[in-house]
């Protein structure tokens, strides 16, 4: 190794250095030199004797003095280049340059050329070779001390560069691992985006189902309205009220069916499943279906307990946090719109209401709802149009028979209502035996064309005697 450095031409002297003079200047030009006292050859220079090429008058220094300075510099350089430790100094300097400008790749062969461990090996090899050939030190102790200190400084510099590389590698590794593993807040954001998209698609599908259901119900209500108008000129407000009630109830049923059956409709298309999975990008469809099924089974209380969350997390393969966030979004985006829709329709989200009462041909339960605080207009369902009898609602002294078909009673202003059940419809049938307390008299029912007066209260008075008003019978034959 020492022979390798001895053969280098740029270490033989300053004349052999291949450095352009335009970059660093002429190496033989006079330069300002600090006082050098550690060298035992050459006279000491005073601080006032600074000469350089940049001096305004380069010819001030005598020629004999300049030649003496150049000779002293040349002798010092030759002494340094010829020192036994100079090849080791050049080696550590090259390693520092490589550690500074070369990218480190630990997995690549030759990546540890500029490490401090390799330099320790180089020192051992160099010491063996030099001791076999010549001594490590020269006859000048000051020069030996200078070389040793220079090697130590470069060695410290190499160690510091190695520490910097280790810190850089550690930072890069941690940063890349942080990018690869998503943070929990990112999962929450993606889950919200995916659930909002899926809920939007489900609501759009349910609106399509409602559009398919509504035309038939509209036709039925139109037929019922025409039947009313053919017999008697019933008020339009009552017809629209019943029509809106039927439409809203069907809308509620359609919404329940469309949302509660995730396996129908567009979900059967595998291409659309893939597109939707890409849009959501986080939860598999099987996991979503499991949680949605649990939600619709517990609509009355859609709040899973901690044990149920753990069970759902095991069934779906998700974390408890993901399950919890999904149910938070589902209660806001699925359950709440259903409650709002049923409230707008005047239909309470109670299974006993929809299952306990039978439905009439008009779509309303036979246990008909009575509106508190609203004038009852005495409109009979379509199935009871041919039934004899004269029903006067909320009887008062102004009850009268509508014999003229051209008369249209004034439209009553509806009040905020609350639904409650009235008596069964069979209690209004003439052939059904009535209790005297219900009829308020023991005599037979009045003639169909007869006007009900104050001393003969009507059957509907038993429904709510507190509600009174001037109401007229519009179903007189």
Curated annotation (Swiss-Prot):
Protein name listed in UniProt: Homeobox protein Meis2
Gene that encodes the chain: MEIS2
Impact when changing residue 85 to A: Impairs interaction with PBX1
Biased segments, Basic and acidic residues type: 193-203
Cross-referenced InterPro entries: HD, Homeodomain-like_sf, KN_HD, PKNOX/Meis_N, TALE_homeobox
Role according to the record: Involved in transcriptional regulation. Binds to HOX or PBX proteins to form dimers, or to a DNA-bound dimer of PBX and HOX proteins and thought to have a role in stabilization of the homeoprotein-DNA complex. Isoform 3 is required for the activity of a PDX1:PBX1b:MEIS2b complex in pancreatic acinar cells involved in the transcriptional activation of the ELA1 enhancer; the complex binds to the enhancer B element and cooperates with the transcription factor 1 complex (PTF1) bound to the enhancer A element; MEIS2 is not involved in complex DNA-binding.
Region (Interaction with DNA): 299-333
Consequence recorded when altering residue 161 to A: Impairs interaction with PBX1
SMART domains xref list: HOX (SM00389)
Impact noted for substituting residue 151 to A: Impairs interaction with PBX1
